[in-house]
Amino acid sequence: MTNILRTLLLATSLAAIPLTATKADAANDTKTTAAKVFEVKNPDFTKSPYSGMTRQHWIEAGEYLLDGAFGHIFSLDDPMYFPKQLEKTYPGNPENSKVAKLEGLARTMFIAGPLLKNNPDLTLHGIKVADYYRHQLMAITNPKSKHFIAKRTGGPSQTLLELASLCISMKAAPEVLWEPLPQEEKDKLAATILSYGEGPTIGSNWMFFNCFALSFFKDQGYKVDEKKLVDWLQKLLDRYKGEGWYNDAPAYDYYSMWAYQSYGPFWVEFFGKHFKPSAESGLPENIYQEISQKFLKNEADLVDNYPYMFARDGRMNMWGRSITYRFAAVTPLPLVEYGNFENVNYGWLRHIASSTLLQFLQHPDFLENGVPTMGFYGPFAPCIQIYSCRGSVYWTGKAFLGLLLPEDSKYWSATENEGPWADQLKPGNVYNKIQPATGLLITNYPNCGGSEMRSWCHETVEKDWQKFRSGENYNKLAYNTEFPWMADGKKGEISQNYGTLNKKGEWEVLRLYDFKDFNNEIYHREAVLETDKNVRYQLNDILLPDGILRVDKVSVPDSTEITLGHYTLPEGSTEFKATLDPGKSFSNRQISLPAMKGEKHGRSVTCYTNGQYELAMIPLYGWTVQEKAIYPDGLHPVSHRCVLPRLSQKVGGSQILVTLQLWKKGANDTGFTARELQPVKSVQVSKDQKTVTITLQSGKKKVVTFE
């Protein structure tokens, strides 16, 4: 599969056909674009007491995003091609941009389809949106057009994804985007798209695109290879593992949600429910309904799991590849209604969706030249993959598929609420939701309102030629909604992970994790170093109301320097920095703590704050050094500088390390108390170094055993 993917991406980046340039082809010319930050006008705090957002506001948000894209369009023939951002993205040469332009077209159409269904006469920057997309659809099969796409002649390609995505949007608003096309144009478009849809694919979420191409044209009366269609649908279902999660060959990430759990229910609602196999296919009469039931059963599983990944206020976590797709993560939430399940809290789901949307639309760094940036908030190269172009960001547009639900639907008519955060997740406690089928762990922290994910990662840098499955998108010990991840530096600047100075003299982080078990609320993993399998970490996470208690054992064949990083804090507000000495971005303070039971001496703890949060990292056992913070530049997705509390020392043989990583919200007002910095009463380690008994101040005991 690796060779296929390599061929695919090289083809995407290099094999496009040089095009005749127009003004918009240059990608840098723009008209006056939308306001920098989206404004919720006339918010409805009766129906939506947290976000103020109603279905109408979602329509306005879609128009706001699409307006920015149309700021680059001067005529019906101009492509959806946007200014390149970050060198690692494609295309490398502006002349080789055909696939990037198709990607911009298909993905902005995710937004346009639902908007046009609501308002077929939508006009942006003096251009009728429906006319533009119909013109572009017909240009695909016009050999005289610079947008012409030839029928497939090779293997899997990005072209398959984008052409099939057009089918999703055409189905969303067929009366505007498909039905007005002349029959001859429909036939030509069917022939081109089916040449890709019935061709080879990759055994991941890509198979959905083949399914949508075949399903759309089957629905329009065209003959398609239904045996292939059913085979791909079955293979997609085979990727399901449990608790709402699909394995995307090989990762668990947001693709489970913005692909499998969005495309599956959409396919059921618009195709599977009413499909009948053709007589010549020889397929069972109810095969499509049987497949539909399986997709919906899997969708039902996510309802009691996935929403817990979001913060109390509805913000999403920075985790996994393609994170620049951002609020596409909420796409499956409204589509839950297609399953007609009982006891669904639609008000909570909509609160999450609207809050995540505003998390980005109201961030000042989200747009540049009217187009979403290549990053999480602003541009941030470490979280971007080489398969992305600037138009890729409009994958976010799938979130607007929820507009296909009517105003009086359960989803849009429910009153926003906080779900279990309101009365079930109580302050002073921590709540873990293990996902047994995958080993993922979701943790909720009512004290701060944050949520945390412990992730899948088992990929070597050597085999990860695209350099994202082995990287920070997956390899952190944990991901928290309150602390977007910092990229690793070359000098040991490593957050929320262990780093080991390997035999090459390079800092190497853990990435080859194996999940072992989750017993007595202890999350147990093991990991080895990629460059030296004799370097072994036994990892145990004990989650506390205000942070993480790590009970780990590192084993090394030779004396080796290691480091363990906490989460990081970006620079605080201008108002906060105004309270500091000139040139400072953070403040810190020392707190003296008494000795724990069984200790002779107490300890001094340094707490760091940016005005919004305070962090503390406290060595309890095995460390011979005190925590010391560093202030990396250019590694954080939110600000240029951040603060990273960390511990670093040399270890030899086997060493047990017990560490507290704590945080407190609203630290500018109060900060940690000495009591809050002492959740652990005692740490007892057996003489054979195989058992650690932790006694918490609450009286609870946690016992960790090592080999």
Predicted regions and their residues:
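Bacterial Sec-dependent N-terminal signal peptides
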Residues: 1-30
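Short alpha-helical segments and helix-capping/turn motifs at coil-helix boundaries
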Residues: 10, 91-96, 148-153, 427, ...
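Low-complexity, Ser/Thr/Pro/Gly-enriched N-terminal "stalk/linker" regions
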Residues: 28-103, 131-136
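Short linear interaction motifs
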Residues: 83-93, 377-380, 420-425, 533
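Aromatic-lined, polymer-binding surfaces characteristic
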Residues: 98-104, 109-119, 126-337
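Carbohydrate-active enzyme catalytic cores, enriched for enzymes
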Residues: 144-149, 189, 283, 311-318, ...
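Catalytic and substrate-binding regions of extracellular carbohydrate-active enzymes
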Residues: 358, 386-406, 410-576, 583
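Extended repeat-based interaction scaffolds and adjacent low-complexity, acidic/S/T/P-biased segments
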Residues: 478, 491-707
